[in-house]
Amino acid sequence: MTTSSIRRQMKNIVNSYSEAEIKVREATSNDPWGPSSSLMTEIADLTYNVVRFSEIMSMVWKRLNDHGKNWRHVYKALTLLDYLIKTGSERVAQQCRENIFAIQTLKDFQYIDRDGKDQGINVREKSKQLVALLKDEERLKVERVQALKTKERMAQVATGVGSNQITFGRGSSQPNLSISHSEQEYGKAGGSPASYHGSTSPRVSSELEQARPQTSGEEELQLQLALAMSREVAEQEERLRRGDDLRLQMALEESRRDTVKVPKKKEVKACCKPGSHSQQTTLLDLMDALPSSGPVAQKTEPWSTGTPANQTNPWGGTVAPANISDPWPSFGTKPAASVDPWGVPTTASIQSVPKNSDPWAASQQPASDAGKTADAWGAAKPSPASGSFELFSNFNGTVKDDFSEFDNLRTSKKPAESGASVPPQDSRTTSPDLFESQSLTSASSKPSSARKTPESFLGPNAALVNLDSLVTKPAPPAQSLNPFLAPGAAAPAPVNPFQVNQPQPLTLNQLRGSPVLGSSASFGSGPGVETVAPMPSVAPHSALGATGSSLTPLGPTAMNMVGSMGIPPSAAQPAGTTNPFLL
């Protein structure tokens, strides 16, 4: 027996504590172990007695008021109170609700022992749990049912054990194991189970008699307990069944949704594919419906000299074959010819086209094609260079640029035949004058820029510069670079129009004494070249019986007459030169 137990017994005798109070003091002692379950069961059974109930509760509230180093008194009192609420009389829970403030104050219990360990946390947590249980009546009822069921099972197990009976002394909380007489008989019988149970049957039967309810109240309590347990089991099974049914229904609904979504996606994909194909076929049908004839334009890669690819005109018109070569060609190659469907066509030779008064009417064809008419918006057919002018078609598939006249002069078989003819000033005809800006302005990226003449940048001293001496004869190319020749046709001999029948260049003294100087001076007295009015009619080049080499030089008087008639000064040049800058 320990010193604390001896001291406790002395206090019990001095203070004349009753049996119930002594048991409560023993269960809530300051010993370093918890209260015994058997002792708490005895105290719970005593709560059904009204006198014992008051003694037990008064001692419990007294233990809850301890503090400091007696923190075990408080903690064990809370543990005992929790057990009494669940397994004792219902009056315990009712009195605890009335004095719940005494339990709530224990949430701030503080104590730190010598080792620095916070021992008050055990009391704080236990008081919080107990307050929450007292405030929740439904939870309290459920836990009371479970605790009573557990207590009954423990009692049945204790009555079924006949080998070792655990008994507790009145003055001590430590169990004492006593060997019963049945164990000795079990050893004598050789350990047979039948002899063992037979020897213990009288004792077991007496314990079963004690476990039976003695009063009608206990019998009613056990009946309510059994009904509550069966009801709880049935409700739990029903909840599980409903949960399973709900999960099964959700899974079926989800699978049904998935099966509906997949065909819709397939239908959408199937609808999208034919739609795109139908759009493409509709566009192709519209393009095929437009009339198209003649050769298809071939477009070369601008950065390489690869195989030309076919290019379709979206407007249905015929695009003449154009050769788009390297944008940085080497010396000797011909300039790139770009295809512009709205540009002004050029001719392969320097022949004038008859004047057409109505741009929207059908053009006049030559004698060989007199019975045919041209449609301005229809599909154009390729025609020779001497044919009529078509407003939206090209004669040779190219568009005039700044150097197209020089290409025509180099590739022409009849160089400078129209040197003395006066060009018409109609925008729908092709002029042989290299400096005629009204009809030879190219439809390129800069249509508004005017063509420069020698007088525009040389002024009145234009006749003093011999431009023929600045032009040198380039080396003849190894092969023909004309993209408009038919395959297999013989290439024409390269002719330089600047060096045909070129006389001996005049010296400065000869230029000063020549009559051309006076006439040019009379025309070049102003800051620029005066505007020449268009003549009503111009004879074609073939009507002129003389070439540029057969013209006679004009004197000053003749030049004045020519100026009064409105003939441009380019027609009054000496007959011996074919310089395009002095025409």
UniProtKB/Swiss-Prot annotation:
A cellular-component GO term for this protein: clathrin vesicle coat
UIM domain sequence ranges: 218-237, 243-262
GO molecular function, one term: clathrin binding
Domain ENTH: 12-144
Pfam family, any one: ENTH
Region span, 3 X 3 AA repeats of N-P-F: 482-581
Biased composition (Low complexity): 437-448
GO biological process, any: endocytosis
Region (6 X 3 AA repeats of [DE]-P-W) residue spans: 301-377
The keyword 4Fe-4S is assigned to this record: no
Residues that, per the record, bind a 1,2-diacyl-sn-glycero-3-phospho-(1D-myo-inositol-4,5-bisphosphate): R8, K11, R25, N30, R63, H73
Chain spans, region Disordered: 165-217, 293-384, 411-457
SUBUNIT field: Binds AP-2 and clathrin. Interacts with ITSN1. Interacts with UBQLN2. Binds EPS15.
The protein, known as: Epsin-2
Species of origin: Rattus norvegicus
Gene it is expressed from: Epn2
